[in-house]
Amino acid sequence: MANGQISPQRAVTKPQSWWLTSEPRPSLMLQLPKPSPSAKPCASVEEAYEICRQVTAQYAKTFYLGTLLMPPAKRRAIWAIYLWCRRTDELVDGPQAATTTPETLDHWERRLEGIFAGQPQDDADVALVDTLETFPLDIQPFRDMIAGQRMDLYRSRYQTFEELDLYCYRVAGTVGLMSSAVLGVDTGNGQAPWQPDAVYIPQEEAIALGVANQLTNILRDVGEDVERGRIYLPLEDLERFNYSEQDLLNGVNDDRWRSLMKFEIDRARHYFEDAERGIRALNRDARWPVWTALMLYKGILDVIEANNYNVFNRRAYVPTPKKLLYLPVAWLRAQVL
């Protein structure tokens, strides 16, 4: 997706939106009850949102910090979306992933359709159903995310960046589209240049932020993914820098690896730059949290560099004091950019 453009492969699934860590999962996220017309969720709407908040706070600390800067209704909606995305990811990347089949994902997609029809099947669904009644979310990004999980069922390698870009759109760019429907746009700020009376909707930039976050995840988690038999770095990039799969398996950190990582980090930063251009189109109450989330995630790339590109046995994370320093900077950017 050069210069913010959607690749032809994913344009066919683009609707009219990274944050998933590899830490231990709570048991709630592993439950996938069978459909039952008579089943009634026991949680109230408030209880359901509290479940979403707790999971987000425990397993996506950096992301959660950004949501606390949002108005209450928006932050709760984002927590509900996060939990659905997390549970979807769990199907192919969690402790019970070995039991997941294409039929499992078919069932999960039918369950999604039920949620959009206002029919929750468990406590966690209750919050998302309520969110759908409040915000104009499209089902297509959710479907596309499930399609991304289908890719993980069959693939552990990506030959080209175009292939990886499609995967990143499906599992993370979609999150940008889901979130932007909640965050909203500033109807008095900026128009599409080819349609002066129209409100500019930063869909491309929303996708770019999701892809940037996913590329950052991939670079941060290289060592963990290799241990699980997965290589997300495009094989054409490894070949370009004369770095083999065996080198990757052995955790070789030499000049070839550092050059490869510099190349990949530059690519991720390009997506972050694309995303930044869309923030000014968001509602004013969304700009500070989005700037904060972007800066926090982009900061992981700086830490990877500071660690001399050692992602094999050192996990890159932004320390809490630095996270707090980002807050006033993000606030200032939200006011003037």
UniProtKB/Swiss-Prot annotation:
Its cofactor is ATP; Mn(2+); Mg(2+). One of its GO terms (molecular function) is metal ion binding. Keywords: Carotenoid biosynthesis, Magnesium, Manganese, Metal-binding, Transferase. Transmembrane segments: none annotated. The keyword Isomerase does not apply. The keyword rRNA-binding does not apply. SUPFAM superfamilies: Terpenoid synthases. CDD domains: Trans_IPPS_HH. ATP is required for the transferase activity but it does not seem to be hydrolyzed during the reaction. PROSITE patterns: SQUALEN_PHYTOEN_SYN_1, SQUALEN_PHYTOEN_SYN_2. One of its GO terms (biological process) is carotenoid biosynthetic process. Pathway: Carotenoid biosynthesis; phytoene biosynthesis. It catalyses: 2 (2E,6E,10E)-geranylgeranyl diphosphate = 15-cis-phytoene + 2 diphosphate. It is an enzyme of class 2 (transferase). Its EC number is 2.5.1.32. InterPro entries: Isoprenoid_synthase_dom_sf (IPR008949), PhytoSynCyanob (IPR054866), Squ/phyt_synthse (IPR002060), Squalene/phytoene_synthase_CS (IPR019845), Trans_IPPS_bact-type (IPR044843), Trans_IPPS_HH (IPR033904). Belongs to the phytoene/squalene synthase family. Involved in the biosynthesis of carotenoids. Catalyzes the condensation of two molecules of geranylgeranyl diphosphate (GGPP) to give prephytoene diphosphate (PPPP) and the subsequent rearrangement of the cyclopropylcarbinyl intermediate to yield 15-cis-phytoene. This is 15-cis-phytoene synthase.
